């Protein structure tokens, strides 16, 4: 089972490539869902309303199973696909790359466009800081208040992040744990009395 993936740490904006008078302005955004994707696309479109094309590609999901390449009016396969191929080449996911083109008066032809969009995506991703993220899941644990030391020790041993702690007589914790530690945590919790847990 896969426990981690590569993505970019933060957005990269306004990389510039000039090709026969045309300008290609590159952007890369970390995106985790459709909403973030939409926001990033709208942001770039609103910043460049007069651009000739806003071409983009994205990959989302652990194995990049959710993906799209959009030519935005350029000849089919000449823009979105070369951008998408750069995401594959860098082995990253949960990333959107946009290349905004301002037409400069000289036609580049399909092979020229492929080369330019590939290069625009490449220089944009070369500026990004590529990081490895570990997959996480949320766990909610209910336990007797006098067991809190045991629970906190267990979570800290596996590097969990506490999101919320409610210390009633029956205490509850919401925590983020790394999926690679899930089985060990489940085993330890199952061995404790008066403890219930569920995954969100």
Annotate each language-model stretch with its function:
Residues 130-145, 175:
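Short glycine-/aliphatic-rich beta-strand segments at the starts of folded cytosolic domains
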Residues 169-170:
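N-terminal positively charged helical leader segments and presequences
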Residues 1-78, 164, 198-200:
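C-terminal regulatory domains involved in ligand/effector binding and gene-expression control
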Residues 141-159:
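Short amphipathic alpha-helix segments
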Residues 27, 54-56, 94-97, 138:
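Structural motif
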Residues 192-197:
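Charged, surface-exposed alpha-helical interface/stalk elements
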Residues 175, 181-184:
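Terminal, non-globular segments
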Residues 79-127:
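Active-site beta-strand/loop microenvironment that shapes enzyme catalytic pockets
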């Amino acid at each position: 089972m896969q426990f981690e993936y590569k993505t970019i740490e933060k957005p990269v904006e306004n990389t510039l490539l000039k090709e026969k008078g045309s300008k290609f302005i590159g952007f890369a955004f970390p995106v985790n869902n459709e909403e973030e994707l939409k926001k990033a696309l709208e942001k770039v479109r609103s910043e460049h309303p007069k651009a000739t094309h806003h071409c983009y590609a994205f990959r989302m999901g652990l194995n990049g199973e959710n993906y799209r390449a959009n030519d935005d009016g350029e000849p089919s396969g000449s823009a979105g696909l070369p951008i998408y191929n750069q995401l594959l080449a860098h082995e990253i996911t949960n990333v959107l790359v946009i290349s905004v083109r301002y037409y400069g008066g000289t036609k580049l032809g399909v092979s020229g466009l492929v080369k330019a969009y590939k290069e625009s995506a490449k220089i944009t991703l070369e500026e990004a800081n590529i990081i490895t993220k570990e997959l996480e899941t949320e766990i909610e644990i209910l336990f007797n208040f006098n067991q809190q030391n045991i629970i906190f020790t267990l979570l800290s041993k596996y590097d969990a992040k506490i999101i919320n702690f409610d210390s009633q007589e029956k205490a509850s914790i919401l925590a983020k744990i790394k999926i690679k530690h899930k089985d060990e945590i489940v085993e330890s919790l199952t061995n404790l009395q008066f403890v219930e847990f569920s995954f969100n």
